Amino acid sequence: MNERRNDIDNARAILIAMVVLGHILNCANPGYSIIPYVLVREFFNAFEMPAFFLLSGMMTDGEKWRRRSTGEYFVRKVKTLVVPYVFFECIAIIYKHFILHTISLTDGLCAMITLHCNVGSDWFLPAMFLACAFYYIYIRFPYKMGWGISCVIFLLMLHFLTPVEGRYWQILLFRGILGFVFMMVGNLLKNQLANLNWKKIGCALFLTAASAAICFKLSLDNSFYSGVLCAPALYLISGTCGASFILGLARRIPWKWLAWIGQNTLVIMGTHQLVLYTIPGNSSPLWVAGVFVLIAAVETAVVYLTNRFCPELIGKKRKEPSYD
C-alpha cells in the first residue's frame, strides 16, 4: 500500500507542477499569440484536472466507507476540502486587501462564501467536494455497469449544458458532475492502471497528444473552469490517457521529495497564484523559468509553515510529539 501511495503522490506532484507552469504561461502569454506557450498549455489542459479527479477515484476505498456512517464520510471531506478552502481563501483575502490593495474585505468574503474564489485555482476544492458527494452515492450503491452507463449520459448532458451568464451555480454543478465522472473512470479502471509498461505509457502519451491536437485544431474547448465540454469523447480519452501517462512515469521515479510535494498538492494549488498576482508579467522564457523557481521557493516555505503550525487547516492531522 505504501508503494502505491507514493506512486499517487508522485503523480500529483507532476500534475501540480504542470498546473503551476500552465498558470505562469498564461501570464506570459495573455494574448495567446506565442504558439509554443499555447501548445504546451493546450497539452496540459487536455488532462491535468481530469487526472486529479481520476486519481482520487482510484484511491477512495469504497469498502472502507461502506462500513462507516455517512456522517463520518462527509466530516472527513469537510476537514480535507472545505476547511482548506476557507483557509486558503482567507489567506488570499488578507493578502489581496492589505498587500496588493486589489479587493475590499467585504468583496473578498462575498467571493469566498459564494464560491467565486479570490484565487482562481481554489475552484478545485468545492468541485472536488461536490464530486465526492456524488461519488458517495456510488459507494453506497456500487453497480458498476449502471454507473458506467450513467457517466456516458452525464457527459452528453454536460456537452449540451451551455453556461448562462449570472447562473454560477450551473458551472459549480458542471464541475462537480464532471469531476465525479472522472472519479468513476479512476475506480472502474484502477486494475488496468495498476499495470502500465512502457508500451502502454507511450501509447497513452500519443493518444493524449493526438486528442489535444484535434481539440486545438478544431477550437474545441473542454474546461472545468469555464464549464464547457465541446468534445466529451476526446476529453474522456485525453483525461484518462494523460492520467495513465503521468501515473506510469510516477511509478518509475523513486525520489522521496517528489512524493512530499504530492502530499502537499492542496497547499500549492491554493496559494501559488498569489505570487503571480504580485509580480509583473513578461513573455521571456527566462522569466517563465525564474518565476517557476520563485514559486517553488515560496511554496517550500508555505508548505513547511502550514505543516508545522496549522496542519488541521490544510486537511492533515497534527503529528504527536515523539519522546523516544
Label every PLM stretch briefly.
Residues M1-D324:
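Alpha-helical transmembrane segments and their immediate juxtamembrane cytosolic regions
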